[in-house]
Every structure is written in structure tokens, then in C-alpha cells.
Amino acid sequence: MERNTPKKAVHFGAGNIGRGFVACFLHESGYEVIFAEVNDATVSKLNTHKSYKVIEVGAEGTTEKTITNYRAINSRSNEAALVEEIATADVVTCSVGPNILKFLAPVIAKGLAARSTDLTPAAVIACENAIGATDTLAEFIKSPENTNPALLEDYDKRATFANSAIDRIVPAQDPDAGLDVKLEKFYEWVVEKTPFKEWAVPDIKGIKWVDNLQPFIERKLYTVNTGHATAAYYGYTRRKSTVYDALQDKDIRDEVKNALKETADLITEKHGIDEEEQKQYVDKIVRRISNPHLEDAVERVGRAPLRKLSRKERFIGPAAELAENGKDCSALLDAAEMAFRFQNVEGDDESFELAKIMEEKKPEEVVQEVCGLQPSEKLYPQVVDIVKRVQADSNEE
């Protein structure tokens, strides 16, 4: 079944990923983009300036794209207008951070409840660095506090929820850049097509549609995000300013490669990915995060250490699986230790919260609370030892 025309997309989060990655592809695919954003200044800028530039940087030079045909709505103060837009949108996307998804659910639920079941179902795609982010969002939307259970009987006529994996490095921006966004040329946006069943998938350039997303999500999270964060946390402890600077240090580069060798062992065995193919993927990732044009500060890449040390994230996720299988995960644990040392970093609330937890709690409590590991898991005692070591060093300082 064909989709509606003219095409309209609602995107939550007008940050760098929202403007520079998701909205760029939606615009190039002929959608009008309505940004849903809570920052008044950003909403005002988007509604005042009728275009902005997306600047792609790489070793082979720079390209610029101009984005137009968009509007912005303050999702906090103008909910009614946003509900109307969602009720008639073809696509609803977001890039707000996994922890914010629960706050989007009420307004999306209202928009979908107001939607005619005669329309093609809205394609809802969360573009977050988290496994199963769209499933998480869907659970919040369909919960009784947000949606009348009676509506769920034919909810597939209102919305199709599809998980995605996104991969693009967007560094901190020049403070004078305004709405313009600088990012790397490389990108990957993979979305599962199976939820669409008899409906046509949305016509969006840049998306690779697949039947099974899990290998793509885990390969990306456990290679790009693991590698990027490992470089940042080692770089921070060794007083490097950018990820590029960190990777010029042979010791740090070796630590990154060792961590990615361990995740490669997991990925190739678990998902049947060819070892040589994964090796080439790893080499490409190391080159990407070594891009001097990105000027990516270690503090930016390392921010939110509590999330990055959590159970399904880039260090503990793969390390726990490797440990259960009796495989080596020592480099991942060393990287996790560096993440535990990312404390009291200016501009990052989670790093202050981590410092407080490390100061006030017993090692076993820290591991269960921060990493979500249970004493029955093989990785548990090894992470307890890391926390003890970091706490001991903090007490000596």
C-alpha cells in the first residue's frame, strides 16, 4: 500500500543529530520536517531562519548541503499543535537520548490516538544509541497511563514501530555555527522492515532496510561506540584534548584495538559475521574516530558515564557475554575502569553523580546499581575489583 502525499515527518530533538543527520535525509526524501523541541531559543531560530547548512568533513574534502522546508514547535508549551501534526504525519522520529524517551511518549500517544485509522500508519523510528530504542518508546506509548487499552486492539492501523541503528560521528560544534551542523561524511542508518508487513516502508533516502537488525545494532554499538568511548576515557585520564590526539598515542591506540578485538570475537561468533569482514570494519572505525577534521573533545565523547557503564551498553554488555562464554574481556574491563575514573567533569552531570555514588556506596552496590550486574554473573567479581581499585585511588588523592 502506498503512503500519503505530500509527505510530512515530525522529529523530536533539534540537536546536531536531529538537524544534521535525520532531518537532512528526511528533507532530501521530500518530507516537510516539523521539529519538536523544548528549547525556546532553538525553536525561535528554526522558525526565523528558513534554511541551514549541513557540512560533511573528511580526508577527501568538505561538502555542504542546504536544508529547507521545516518548522519547529515547542513540545512543552504548544502540545496541542504538536498532537495535530503527529495525527497526520507519515513519519515520527527522535534523537533525544535514550533516557528522554519516556517524556516523549505522552504527546506521541495523544497524536496517535487522534489519528484516523484510514491513513497509512505512522512509521515511528527512534534514532538513538541504544538497543531496541523504538521498542522502549512503544512500551511507554502503549502503557495505560498514556493510551486507552481499548485503542490497542487495532493500534497497528495507527502506527508501525521499527527499531533502527544509527552511526555517524557529530562532534561538538563551533559556538558561532548557529543552526549549521558539521559532521563526518560516513553514515549508516539501518532500520528493520519486518514490522511494516503489508505496508510499504517509508521512502527515506539513506536508510538500509533489513529483516534482522540485531547484528547491525550490536556490531555498531560494540565497535563504534566501544572504540570511541575507550579512546575518550583513556584520553581523558592521560590529559589529551581530543579523540584524535588520544589516538596518536600508541598505548591508547593499542588499548582501543584490544577492546575491539574482544568485541569482534563476540560479534563474529554470535552473528556469523566473517572475521575478515569484521576486521575491515574495525580498521575503518579506528580511521573514522581518528579523523582530525572532527576536533572531537574527549569530554564530549566521554559524557554520561553512568549510561555508558550500564548493563546493555558498550563495555558491560559485550564483556558480560564474553565472560559467560569463558572468553577474554580484560581490555573491555580496563576501558570500563577508565570510564569509572571519568568523575566531576565540568559540564557533565552524570560524571558528578558517578563521583557521588563511588564515594558513598560499597563496591558491590556500585556494580549492581551502575552496571546492573548480579552476583551470579561471571563478570560481577571482576567489576567489583575495578570499583575497589578506583575507590582506593580516590581515597589516596
From Swiss-Prot:
* Active-site residues annotated for this sequence: K220
Keyword Cytoplasm appears in the UniProt entry: no
Key words, A-Z: NAD, Oxidoreductase
Fetch the SUPFAM superfamilies from UniProt. 6-phosphogluconate dehydrogenase C-terminal domain-like (SSF48179), NAD(P)-binding Rossmann-fold domains (SSF51735)
Extract the Gene3D superfamilies matched here: N-(1-d-carboxylethyl)-l-norvaline Dehydrogenase, domain 2, NAD(P)-binding Rossmann-like Domain
Enumerate the catalysed reactions: D-mannitol 1-phosphate + NAD(+) = beta-D-fructose 6-phosphate + NADH + H(+)
One example GO MF annotation: mannitol-1-phosphate 5-dehydrogenase activity
What does the record give as EC number? 1.1.1.17
* Keyword DNA repair in record: no
Q: How does it assemble?
A: Monomer.
Assigned protein family:
Belongs to the mannitol dehydrogenase family.
- Described purpose of this protein according to its UniProt entry: Catalyzes the NAD(H)-dependent interconversion of D-fructose 6-phosphate and D-mannitol 1-phosphate in the mannitol metabolic pathway.
Q: What is this protein called?
A: Mannitol-1-phosphate 5-dehydrogenase
Natural source organism:
Podospora anserina (strain S / ATCC MYA-4624 / DSM 980 / FGSC 10383)
